[in-house]
Amino acid sequence: MKRSVTLRGETFVFSDLRELMARANEPKAGDRLAGIAASSERERVAAKMALAEVPLHSFLDEPLIEDDVTGLIVSSLDHQAFAAIRSLTVGELRELVLTSSFASEWERGLKGALTPEMVASAARIMSARDLMTAAAPLRAVTKCRNTMGGRGVLGVRVQPNHPTDDIAGVLLSALDGLLFGCGDAVIGVNPAGDSIENVVALEHALHDLISAVGVPTQSCVLAHFTTQLEALERGAPVDLLFQSIGGTEATNAGFGVTLQGLAEGLEAVLASHVGRDGFIGDNVMYFETGQGTALSVDGHGGIDQLTCEARAYGVARAFDPFLVNSVVGFIGPEYLANEREIMRAGLEDHFMGKLLGLPMGIDICYTNHVEANQDTTDQLLILLATAGCNFVMGVPGSDDVMLNYQSTSYHDAAGVRELVGACPAPEFEEWLEQTGIYEGGKLSELAATGPDSLLAFTNSVKELGL
């Protein structure tokens, strides 16, 4: 359906919703690369004006693409709850999510009444402060071996990657993270090698570490989900099943992923937990996403990268995950060119994920050839912590020596918790107090004494081979 707007004597015509949404998006290198971005700021403003007048039911009447992701989104929509808002426009949805009463309405059922396309449309007519204000009161609480997402909780994934998957190196980095109070979200390793044997070894090592120190958290080895399932069949203790996902069927095919395969993986991991101790909930999936991933595998189908990202959240929502995070800035300047685009994408992704009911975290990061620096990550970290982000990354020294990109460090996460008055997951914080790493809700002197504290802590896990 065509839509047109006349702005200062110039008429802009948009052939369909897909084109309208792409033109209304904030500047993104990926959209420019795909040839779908607005050609001028005036066209962008005109598109935003037209998009604000689109009724929400149009996103069901005019699907952007016909594929299995669209089918999943439509079938999982709470149509009864949607009936109450179907005639609202995108602009009216923006106004609704910014009201003080919205969080209560959202909790009572509106979070199931929105499709990713609706949420993505609202995001592109919101300011940075709007995105933060709307997301902050929305909480998505999940349980695996601890409880994530409660009000005031800022979780941290410990990411102890190693360029050769050296077990001692991985565990030493993980212990370093624990001493900073990090690791409540997950101790998650990206393996340098994707062999079954390597994944099995890493799964056992992380499990043994968690058992040895008695920390209430979960581990994950971020290999392809099929590799993790093969490791599970060989006896590996899989706490969380990880997979990168996209917002179109073609993108997921490029990742070697099917919706049926994810469903079968979920059931396999849940079944494996029946015979293991320590689990307090059934949220066992961990998904990563990121603006630009669909374009990177030529699977976007003409849809802009913000909308593709939101649709990936539609996939994630169907599997009731424990964690979801956008790796904002990871795939480079071809998709997010600079600090401005990275910061905007991080706030958009967090808002969209939260509005769709996800336990949303952000890997606040950049590659070494993009126009950004550690001030970028500092600023976005503070903004997201203020906006109620579920979790962020903890990377030793901010520099991932295996993936070769820059993220947030253990000390960054600890510092921003203190700055905004956030805390770890409750079970994890209790363990921190018991071990002396925390004292009165803050890092203790024991944790601040550097190598001596690390040496003292590792004495309890000598049997792991450190």
Give a label for each model feature.
Residues M1-L171, L179, D184-L466:
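Anaerobic metallocofactor- and corrinoid-dependent redox/one-carbon enzyme cores
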